[in-house]
Amino acid sequence: VYDYLKFQKQKDKALNTLKASGSDLRTYWEFLNDSGYEYDKVTPKMIAEFIDYLRASDDDVIALNKESKRTNKTINRILSTIHMFYQFEADMQEIDNPILMHDVNRPFNALKGILEHAKSDNKTKQSIFKVKESDYKINLVTDDEMELFLSRLDKRRDILLYKMLYLTGARIQEVLDLEIESVPLPDMSQLVGCFRQIKSKGKTRDLYVPMSLIKELDDFIMEERNLIDTDHSYIFVSEQKRQLGKQLTYRAAYDKLKKVQEEIDVDFNFHDLRHTFCSNLVQSGMDVSVVRMIMGHEH
């Protein structure tokens, strides 16, 4: 990344352009790290995951059908930065560019007067991942859709993972980072319990969880998770032989999400679950300041 930005600086790119490129690539590397991917082995399928990741990063919104913090225009700019980075890497190290391009017709009004003679060759390159630059609407998930989704999961671990997302509004990485010692003792005389000071975007916050779900987690830990020997205490770990005991990755959770969705024809991403939970709180008449506290918003 340093070499690429240095190359861009040598081409007299504006300082703001260099800052934007650095920010875009930092976001991309955060996704790679969260997913366990290596930058030189990224495939087009992983780029599609990255687009979902970008959309799911809108965390500080409380409104029904609010547009994403990252507009589709911003997402396209980030993809353009990554495409140019891989073009540079392809020249330097012969790394394949995972952002595939195809030929498209230029819109007529994009032709300037001096280019009128070139209309017969009116083609330009465009990423196959380019998203429509209109407001991205959050998809609210119904109880029936979620029950159908959960019914198709075959692992107790996965059912609990997605219940945590749907019933608490937690971010996916917050759930993946939950540790056994953070689980409060089940007290069925209470409706809600609190996971104190969980990891959240480089900081910490409290996570409020239905007591019935805390009981399910506690039973799962005692009956299944504790049977897997690890040198860490993450609740959600891989159960595959080759990766046994390693912290469950964003990639694994994403793959499971998409696999089940293909079977039931119900489409949503991780952040849709968070936004659905938030929207349900707002619709119930809860004070917005309380909703912000529950969702872990700073302001």
List the model feature ranges, each with a label.
Residues 2-16, 25-114:
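N-terminal core-binding DNA-recognition domain of tyrosine recombinases/integrases
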Residues 97-143, 239-244:
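Flexible interdomain linker/hinge and immediately adjacent N-terminus
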Residues 133-172:
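Basic, Lys/Arg- and aromatic-enriched nucleic-acid-binding interface segment
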Residues 146, 157-159, 250, 254, ...:
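Short, leucine-enriched amphipathic alpha-helices that occur as contiguous helical runs
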Residues 211-266:
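Active-site/catalytic core of tyrosine-dependent DNA strand-transfer enzymes
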